[in-house]
């Protein structure tokens, strides 16, 4: 009886740990990038790092989704991705030819934060659509 109780207790503990791990894994961690509110040099690094983090996340999620798809679905996802990239770039793109000043640098920082935020939204949408943890 004692052996059976211990076995049931261990099985219950294992199930609890597994369900906790699964629910922790299932959460999509959203980053909030508030880079514009800090000293310029750190703000610039913050925005650039945000892009790196979010592009890496999107690449991982996209590739995991892509591997699950058949040929037709892959083409569809590629087409959607290209359209999304154009939309994101139209929304967030910043280009300046001329002398740099603080206003221009902060505009670039804002554009980079926009790119990171839009990329994060795309990662979340693909992860949700294809049930990627």
What are these regions (language model features)?
Residues 12-14, 110:
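Generic detector of short alpha-helix boundary/capping microenvironments
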């Amino acid at each position: 009886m004692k052996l059976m109780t211990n076995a049931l207790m261990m099985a219950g503990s294992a199930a609890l740990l597994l369900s906790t791990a699964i629910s922790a894994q299932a959460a999509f961690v959203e980053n909030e990038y508030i880079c514009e509110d800090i000293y310029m040099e750190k703000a610039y690094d913050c925005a650039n790092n945000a892009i790196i983090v979010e592009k890496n996340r999107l690449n991982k999620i996209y590739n995991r989704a892509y591997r699950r798809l058949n040929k037709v679905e892959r083409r569809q996802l590629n087409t959607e991705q290209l359209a999304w990239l154009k939309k994101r770039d139209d929304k967030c793109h910043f280009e300046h030819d001329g002398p740099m000043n603080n206003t221009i640098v902060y505009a670039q920082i804002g554009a980079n934060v926009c790119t990171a935020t839009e990329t994060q939204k795309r990662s979340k949408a693909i992860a949700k659509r294809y049930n990627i943890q």
